[in-house]
Amino acid sequence: MIRTGMLALGLLFALPAQAAEQRVYLVATMQLDGSSLAQSVFLHEPDITDLDGCREAVREGQRARDWQKYHHIFRSDRFKGFSGHMQYRCALSELEFSMWRDGPRYNRSYLIGVDEDEMLSAQRTPSQAQCMAQLRALSPSQQAQSLCAMSNQDLTP
């Protein structure tokens, strides 16, 4: 009896101490109108722990035009002669991204998806062209939930 209990206890400790933690992300995407060109940032605020909190922070940021949470800057001065629009999407993910810093090097291509359960997926692709090929290979319903975008953040292991 004691052996069985010890074995069960040993197996319990052999399991990972904790499943990967789901983080709440704000995926902010600037899409250049009339094209497939987009830039995305993956923003995480440790004190926002649910999707409703994320959506409220987006409403407040858009209303006040002062992002107290998920602080970011849309550099419209870099897009003179072009029009674009911002899309904000709150999502959950076990992925971890490096911190976003405003900078010129949006040179990492990602296939990004947010499914009907608001789960974020992001897959690094070698190029924007290869990302578009992967996007076109998805089912129509998956295509509607996905996009290709450039980012200056890395996925961290």
What kind of region is each of these model predictions?
Residues 14-17:
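N-terminal signal peptide c-region/cleavage motif recognized by signal peptidases
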Residues 1-6:
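Bacterial N-terminal signal peptides that target proteins for export
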Residues 20-157:
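Mitochondrial intermembrane space
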